[in-house]
Amino acid sequence: MSKNKLSKGQQRRVNANHQRRLKTTAEKADYDDNLFGETSEGIVISRFGMHADVESADGSVHRCNIRRTIRSLVTGDRVVWRPGKDAADGVNVKGIVEAVHERASVLTRPDFYDGVKPIAANIDQIVVVSAILPELSLNIIDRYLVACEAQDIEPLIVLNKIDLLDDDGLRFVNEQMDIYRNIGYRVLMVSSRTQDGLKPLEAALTDRISIFAGQSGVGKSSLLNALLGLNEDQILTNDVSDVSGLGQHTTTAARLYHFPHGGDVIDSPGVREFGLWHLEAEQITHGFVEFHDYLGHCKYRDCKHDNDPGCALREAVENGKIAESRFENYHRILESMEQVQVKTRKNFSSSDD
């Protein structure tokens, strides 16, 4: 994926924030090594400011401080940590995270002040949850798929609430989902209420670290609670409510949970919705995987893939090689990006002067 470009004002803010953090860190004393035991391997299951909950090999969870030399630590990181000892006055000393292993993958989101911000690590797949209610939106599904391709993390499309469909509705929705099956995406149709289709979903989640993405109202929390086997008293409460747009942020901490059937999930409202405004137009184009065979074959090198003469993509649409809905959503995404980028430039205009 090509490097995301920031405006001069955004870059100045990123650098200023980083220098401020370094100055604050330098003024603080580091932790006394004598307060901690031997090093162990662990995984970060949640991050709270300057502390992290680390799960050890035996499954126990330890609240840890974070060495000031560690610049980035997120849920899912594999770490080296040391347990705290009891100090002489009987006050329990927290553990400490000493180092972070190299990440197999990192999930990021655009941030107005810090550029592209990591929010979860070592994710194997993003479960894109949609539903027939409040409405089945292929445009939203396509936006999530573009985000997955940009992050280079495999997506799994899960369509929830199929119990609300009659036979004709089910047939229509299956035809819509065939668009994605035919270009290589995995699609599962489930109902968190009746638990139809949950067994195949459990199999797809086993031995993997997953994260659920989807708009409010599609039943993400209901699915997670069913998969985690939680009762009403244990139900996950950090779902996003009254949020309809991509790219919304939240301060609720991400947390890693273990599925009883195997596999893990990182649950966080902050990573369930993705913004695309930080991506280049070429990245959006590349995010439509069925376009790849036709890119570079247009009559003109600067083809915008719209009404340009000799456009290979439009010809593929006309010949039924590319779904018309996907091609239309591609242009909708580009248009929405332009609108958001204009607003972003206005927000930072005072800083650029």
UniProtKB/Swiss-Prot annotation:
Residue numbers binding GTP: 160-163, 214-222
**GO terms, biological process:** ribosomal small subunit biogenesis
Highest taxon above the source species: Bacteria
Kindly list the cofactors needed: Zn(2+)
Cellular component aspect of the GO annotation: cytoplasm
> Disulfide pairs?
none
Task: Decide whether keyword Cytoplasm is in the record.
Answer: yes
Q: Which CDD domains match?
A: YjeQ_EngC
Q: What Pfam families does UniProt report for this protein, alphabetically? A: RsgA_GTPase
Q: Which InterPro entries match?
A: G_CP_dom (IPR030378), NA-bd_OB-fold (IPR012340), P-loop_NTPase (IPR027417), Ribosome_biogen_GTPase_RsgA (IPR004881), RsgA_GTPase_dom (IPR010914)
Which parts of the sequence belong to the CP-type G domain?
A: 104-274
| Residues that, per the record, bind Zn(2+) | 298, 303, 305, 311
**Where does the record say this protein resides?**
Cytoplasm
Renumbered to this chain, region (Disordered) spans: 1-25
Please explain the role this protein plays, according to its UniProt record: One of several proteins that assist in the late maturation steps of the functional core of the 30S ribosomal subunit. Helps release RbfA from mature subunits. May play a role in the assembly of ribosomal proteins into the subunit. Circularly permuted GTPase that catalyzes slow GTP hydrolysis, GTPase activity is stimulated by the 30S ribosomal subunit.
Q: How does it assemble?
A: Monomer. Associates with 30S ribosomal subunit, binds 16S rRNA.
User: What name goes with this protein?
Assistant: Small ribosomal subunit biogenesis GTPase RsgA
Q: Which organism is it from?
A: Klebsiella pneumoniae (strain 342)
